[in-house]
Design a protein with these regions (language model features):
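Short acidic/histidine-rich motifs immediately flanking catalytic phosphotransfer sites
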Residues: 208-216
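A glycine-centered loop/beta-turn motif at secondary-structure junctions
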Residues: 318-357
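Cysteine-nucleophile active-site neighborhood
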Residues: 218-285, 293, 338-353
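Beta-strand-turn-beta hairpins that frame and shape the catalytic cleft
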Residues: 167-172, 280-283, 321-326
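Catalytic beta-strand/loop cores that center a nucleophilic Ser/Cys/Thr
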Residues: 282-323, 357
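Active-site glycine-centered loops adjacent to acidic/histidine catalytic or metal-binding residues
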Residues: 112, 247, 290, 332
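Proline-centered loop/turn at the N-terminus of a beta-strand
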Residues: 106, 171, 242-244, 260, ...
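RNA-binding accessory domains that recognize and position tRNA/RNA substrates
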Residues: 1-204, 208-209, 223, 336, ...
Length: 357
């Protein structure tokens, strides 16, 4: 069946339908990872977006459900050059086409994803429609495509109630703004008892449990939309509990302490982004998935200082908070998918909690 990707600038790509045949309008982004497509599909940070995979062949090792980073797939749509018809992997359980169908994700394959990525790179992230309707009217659909905006996605992806992953070590409160499983797993593997809280939990409820540390997770959308959450993070900041924040959590902590954020032209999404530790001068390859960054020009040096920067575009990749046991990073030290170069940051968080004891 034919499928069409219509961008808000009027560009149309014709290809073949994959997954669900329902029509969808979404924000079109691209990911440069060569592997890890299942982790990408199950990353809650993609809620409200349709993701383009720049690597040309997707699905060649099938689907292994143990590799999922959440309970379901989150992107609105999926765009690939070629979808593998056969999977070669002893861990394979299902073809990716079945996974897309089971999760009701519409997609398109057989288009020039390099050309699409160049458009997004040059013009910036834009909205688009995936449809199987061959009789679409461009004049009618373009206004609808342009009207779309990503809203309310943190409330959509967060857990409905708190739950506990038992452990005999430090007690960590993890605020779930769209947390990938490997954040809790990385803490759990280090012996932590992890209590996962819904995104809109009051700070008083969390602090009443006397946690040894607080983790602010990744998540989707514009951080400035999370007004209620930012107010609670202000209270967490004023406590003496060690805090480690990743991605959206990093942005929310910055907003809670008076800094600002802005949108990137086309975002950082992939498993090959170099970041530099400004204290040691060392560079690491990191996994990233964000469309917003902290604006360094708005930082108060008495509150926070830059700890990491992006080697490619010099944007902020991490902060250390002055006089506080708080550090935050824009990238994903938990990876999945991606390199484990910065997993040591979880050990640093462990050391912070032990010192507090």
């Amino acid at each position: 069946m034919k499928a069409f990707l219509i961008l808000e600038d009027g560009t149309v790509f014709e290809g073949t339908s994959i997954g669900s045949t329902r029509e969808v309008i979404s924000e079109i982004v691209f990911n440069t990872s060569m592997t890890g497509y299942l982790e990408v599909l199950t990353d809650p940070s993609y809620a409200g977006q349709a993701v383009t995979m720049t690597y040309p062949l997707i699905g060649n090792y099938g689907v292994c459900y143990k590799d999922m980073e959440s309970q379901k797939a989150w992107p609105d749509g999926y765009i690939v050059r070629e979808l593998s018809r056969m999977a070669s992997n002893f861990r394979n359980e299902d073809p990716i086409q079945k996974f897309l169908l089971d999760n009701d994700i519409p997609g398109i394959c057989g288009i020039d994803t390099r050309a699409l990525t160049k458009i997004l790179r040059e013009k910036g992230t834009m909205n688009g429609m995936i449809t199987t309707n061959e009789n679409y009217n461009l004049d009618e659909v373009l206004p609808k495509i342009k009207e779309y905006s990503v809203k309310g996605v943190v409330r959509k992806v967060t857990c409905s109630e708190k739950y506990v992953l038992p452990g005999k070590g430090p007690k960590v409160a993890l605020m779930d703004f769209g947390a990938k499983k490997n954040i809790a797993r990385s803490l759990n593997n280090r012996g932590c008892e992890v209590t996962v809280y819904p995104a809109y939990t009051k700070a008083e409820e969390i602090l009443a449990t006397n946690p040894d540390g607080i983790m602010l997770s990744n998540g989707p959308g514009d951080p400035k939309e999370c007004v209620e959450i930012i107010e609670e993070i202000k209270k967490l900041y004023n406590s003496n509990v060690p805090i480690f924040a990743i991605c959206l959590g990093h942005q929310l902590m910055a907003l809670a302490t008076g800094a600002d954020t802005h949108r990137l032209k086309y975002g950082h999404r992939g498993a090959n982004h170099p970041v530099k530790d400004l204290k040691t001068g060392k560079c690491y390859i990191s996994s990233q998935n964000h469309g917003y960054v902290v604006d360094e020009s708005t930082l108060d040096s008495k509150v926070a200082v830059t700890a990491f920067e992006n080697v490619n575009d010099k944007t902020n990749e991490g902060l250390e908070y002055v006089g506080k046991n708080i550090f935050t990073v824009q990238f994903h030290p938990e990876a999945c998918a991606g390199p484990q170069d910065t997993a040591y940051l979880f050990d640093r968080f462990m050391d912070m909690m032990k010192k507090e004891d």
